[in-house]
Amino acid sequence: MTNENKHSDCSNMANQGMNDASSARKGSITHVIFDMDGLLLGINTEKFYTEVQEIILARYNKNFDWSLKAKMMGKKAIEAARVFVEETGISDSLTAEDFLEEREEMLQKMFPTSDLMPGASRLIHHLHENGIPICVATGTHTRHFDLKTQRHSELFSLMHHIIRGDDPEVKQGKPSPDIFLAAANRFEGGPVDPLRILVFEDAPSGVLAAKNAGMSVVMIPDARLDSTYHKVADQVLKSLLDFSPADWGLPPFENASTKLN
């Protein structure tokens, strides 16, 4: 989800109820893992990638569409770059490596302006204050992570740990479960049983990665993403503002004002 206005008509959004398997886990969730791009950091972060990739493709008289974006989301940079040049048919003119180098120059100037998604701060503070161990598992490499989060250091300091895409334990990007299994291993007293972990994701490949790791997943997809990608998730919501911790046996928001902030 990309803006607060989308929350105002949430009643029009088709919310997927939790399936039998995920409902059976209600009350067993003890730890939470967050993706970052498009989930905690949103509007600008994803928009930046899209804008840069549109500029590059325009040189070849090609368009960057959502079917291509969906295939790239959540993957490691080099893996997404290969999808980009191969799916668009420009691999003979632009290598994946050259694409990344060109994209990097433009992104360096954009990332420091990244904004938080609606509901992100509220949920993270709530879980932290109630003693629920939380972490971030993002395909973003350290150099980009530092740029994207520099305005939000206080919020990210609440995380027990942060796993980035260039972590040595992450051999393969999403939809491989590597990054979520690495995250589970590093909680205090870890590894944590995947059945006790709830993951928040926006990307189809990230949802698959979490399910491949044996974890439950709440998906907060961009409204433009084809709904066929929603099917794998245990729950689909329009925004983090719509998440009810009590649905998963987590401490509920104490009052209405907390819930809406």
List the predicted regions and their residue ranges:
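A metal-dependent, Asp-based hydrolase signature
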Residues: 71-109, 118, 122-129
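Asp-based, Mg2+/Mn2+-dependent phosphohydrolase catalytic module
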Residues: 2-29, 125, 141-261
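Active-site neighborhood of HAD-like aspartate-dependent phosphohydrolases
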Residues: 10-70
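Short helix-capping segments at alpha-helix termini
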Residues: 59-62, 89-94, 153-158, 191
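Short, acidic loop-to-helix structural element flanking the phosphoryl-transfer center
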Residues: 19-28, 108-136, 146
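Residue-level detector of anion-binding/catalytic polar loops
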Residues: 63, 133, 216
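Anion (oxyanion) recognition and catalysis
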Residues: 58, 128, 211
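Helix-loop "lid/cap" segments that line or gate small-molecule binding pockets
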Residues: 53-57, 76-92, 148-149, 183-185
